[in-house]
């Protein structure tokens, strides 16, 4: 099953704005602090935050989305 890696940071205002949306989404996700988990951030080449990376069960990237997007956009992206 796929899940979302939600790359974020405590100092990032758009990340803070996206947090409640992700909580309401009902989608499987793991929040990753780019300052704390630099290895995972580097693995996926994260350059901007917030970034959502959809991965398969093995951690292979399927697709990604950057920015503070509305819930419907995130759900359509994940389910598409």
Residue ranges and their predicted role:
Residues 11, 36-38, 69:
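Residue-level detector of flexible, active-site-proximal loop/helix-junction positions
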């Amino acid at each position: 099953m796929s899940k979302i890696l939600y790359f974020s940071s405590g100092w990032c205002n758009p990340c803070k704005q996206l947090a409640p949306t992700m909580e309401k989404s009902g989608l499987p996700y793991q929040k990753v602090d780019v300052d704390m988990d630099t290895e995972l951030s580097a693995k996926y080449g994260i350059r901007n935050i917030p970034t959502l990376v959809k991965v398969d069960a093995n951690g292979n990237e399927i697709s990604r989305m950057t920015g503070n997007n509305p819930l419907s956009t995130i759900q359509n992206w994940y389910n598409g």
